[in-house]
Structures are given as C-alpha cells and as structure tokens.
Amino acid sequence: MALGPAAMGYDRAITIFSPDGSLYQVDYAFEAVKRGWTTLGVKTKSGVVLLAEKRKATQLLDVDGIEKIFMLDDHVGCTFAGLASDGRILIDYARSQALQHRLIYDEPISIEYLTKVISDVKQAYTQHGGVRPFGVALIVGGIDKGKQPKLLMTEPSGQFMPYYAVAIGQGGYTATEYLEKNYKEDLDIQSTILLALRALMATLKPGEKLNYSSVEIGYADVDSGTFKKLTTEERSDLLQKI
C-alpha cells in the first residue's frame, strides 16, 4: 500500500482512522496473515477438521518439531496463520480460559464463547496506544453440547465469524475456491479430512507434493465429541488415498 505524506499520520497511529475509515496497522496485520502457511477448517454434519501446511524455509529446518494444530480443551482445537509468536500467546490464553471455565462451572466452555474471548483480546489491541494488533488469524473448531460441530475464525481486527469451511494464509484464496466448488455438508469425517487435503493440494505449485511431514491434521467427530490429532502413520495412510 503506497501512502503519501498526508496519509503517513494514519499509517503510524494505530488508534486513528484514516478519512476512508481504515486503520492501517490493522490492515497490515491482515497482510501478515496472508503471508502465513496455508491453513483451513471444514465443518460437516459428522464433525470438524482443521488442517495446516508446514513448509521448509530451509533444508535444515526440522518441520516435524513444528506444531500447527493445538488442542484448547478436550472438545475443541485451533490452528492459525500469521505470526507464530502471536498465535502462541493467544493459544496459551485460550487454554487458560477454557481450564478456568471448567474449574468454575464444571462444564466445557462453549466454542463460540471461547472464540469471543480470543477476539476480545485482539480487539483491545486495535484501540490502545503503545501496542500493535495481533498479526494472526485463528481458526477454532470442535464439538459443542448436543453434538453440535462448530467452526469459527478470528481476524486481527477482533471480528469473528462462523463458517462451514474457511481457508487462510498464502494459499487461502485458491483453497477457498476449491472448497466452494466441492463442499458437501453430509460428508463423513474421513471424507471431510480428504476434502481438506485436496483443498490444500490445490494450492501447491507444479511439481510440489504433500507428505506426512508437510501437513498437520486435527479433527473432532460428533460421535466421540473429542478433539484429536492424526499421527504420522494416519496422515501417511490418508495421503495414499488421494
């Protein structure tokens, strides 16, 4: 975004709107999300799937040691695109809020409320001086009371929305196009995982391939109501089916 001298004041100040209604620092935080590894979530009647790509920035990087899918509580997990350090802080906060809710109310926290808690923190960092917005978007998914699958995404601005399927990061646009054409609500959980994998594969450049080290997968199915992560062997077996 090229800015002239008149716009530079709005560019530098997080709490001042530009004449066209923009908060430039929040807009830049969205750019950090777009630069992140491709990440997506899919919700069907059978459950919720979260999937995250992992890329080697250098041949010496051990991607097996990088975590991109996180359990927040027994029934809910999340993933993110953007600044990993920002994501880690928000995930730790979400985990503490979920645990606190269990201790006080003796029941799991609702997924929408947990997402709101995360989003409230993000929103607060868009209107105070001396801080910057969180340069990360989180996709939160799991199974609520009554075996209700839930999938939501929080933006750097603090806004959050429910989705049937959502994709963010470098390949977010291409993955979203694939999901719009191929999404079906009545898929079983394995078919939902395969749909998410194919959406990620649609973002790859010619000659690139997915393997068990370059993707991380988590899911929650309505039958068990719990969030799980696929093992290396399970990821490898699924990739052979594509």
UniProtKB/Swiss-Prot annotation:
Keyword flag Cytoplasm: yes
Family classification: Belongs to the peptidase T1A family.
Coiled coil regions in record: none
Functional summary from the UniProt entry: Component of the proteasome core, a large protease complex with broad specificity involved in protein degradation.
Subunit structure: The 20S proteasome core is composed of 14 alpha and 14 beta subunits that assemble into four stacked heptameric rings, resulting in a barrel-shaped structure. The two inner rings, each composed of seven catalytic beta subunits, are sandwiched by two outer rings, each composed of seven alpha subunits. The catalytic chamber with the active sites is on the inside of the barrel. Has a gated structure, the ends of the cylinder being occluded by the N-termini of the alpha-subunits. Is capped at one or both ends by the proteasome regulatory ATPase, PAN.
GO MF annotation list: threonine-type endopeptidase activity
Record-given protein name: Proteasome subunit alpha
Regulation of protein activity: The formation of the proteasomal ATPase PAN-20S proteasome complex, via the docking of the C-termini of PAN into the intersubunit pockets in the alpha-rings, triggers opening of the gate for substrate entry. Interconversion between the open-gate and close-gate conformations leads to a dynamic regulation of the 20S proteasome proteolysis activity.
UniProt cross-references to HAMAP family, sorted A to Z: Proteasome_A_A
Alphabetized Pfam families for the sequence: Proteasome, Proteasome_A_N
Keyword entries, A-Z: Cytoplasm, Proteasome
Cellular component, GO, one term: cytoplasm
Organism, as annotated: Sulfolobus acidocaldarius (strain ATCC 33909 / DSM 639 / JCM 8929 / NBRC 15157 / NCIMB 11770)
Localization: Cytoplasm
Claim: Cytoplasm is one of the keywords in the record: yes
Listed GO biological process terms: proteasomal protein catabolic process; ubiquitin-dependent protein catabolic process
CDD domains xref list: proteasome_alpha_archeal (cd03756)
